[in-house]
């Protein structure tokens, strides 16, 4: 009975990590496509030029792909070294997530202050030749979230000139509508809009985060269960 349960656990872990690995491959592909087609897409901060949406997706995709590969191969081959590596990688990711969350809440005011400062400095790159991705990202955010600038529409005056904002800041978008127009604009800054979006969707985001946490803990538990079984028997069990 125990042997049958462990056999089921082995293949369940293999299947789960195979899906995990495929998702990682997909994310890596999307990240590479964004990097090639959009350049530094969503590189809002000049202080961290490598921290673009494309690079983040590539990094996350690579981590997911490597983790899924370790779990997949470790489960199907009943390899203790791979299973232990899978456990350690998940543990490091879990600890890193917890540390980042704690630091974020402890230094929330400083994070907000520095983020606004960096984003405003990033606006200066809006019309630069090598940052078409940043321009597209700002245009999409302002059009979709009905906002303008970082704190308000006046942030653009230092970039585009007095009384001039991107056309996507207009309530009714048209060619040249952002020039000498300070009335029919979205007046709320995008930073507050994004914060409000997170606040409005905190329950959904919390649920997703909890599901990820449970998935990581289960992955660690399953891998250690298989590891201990293989360690005790000293050989593979027949599947």
From Swiss-Prot:
Membrane topology: Multi-pass membrane protein
Post-translational modification (record): Glycosylated.
Keyword Transmembrane helix: yes
UniProt KW keywords: Glycoprotein, Membrane, Transmembrane, Transmembrane helix
Compartments reported by the entry: Membrane
Main subcellular localisation: membrane
Cysteines joined through disulfide linkages: none
Membrane-crossing segments per the record: 14-34, 56-76, 86-106, 204-224
Matches recorded under InterPro entries: Tetraspanin/Peripherin (IPR018499), Tetraspanin_animals (IPR000301), Tetraspanin_CS (IPR018503), Tetraspanin_EC2_sf (IPR008952)
Family according to the record: Belongs to the tetraspanin (TM4SF) family.
Name by which UniProt lists this protein: Tetraspanin-9
Species this chain originates from: Ovis aries (Sheep)
Lineage of the organism: Eukaryota, Metazoa, Chordata, Craniata, Vertebrata
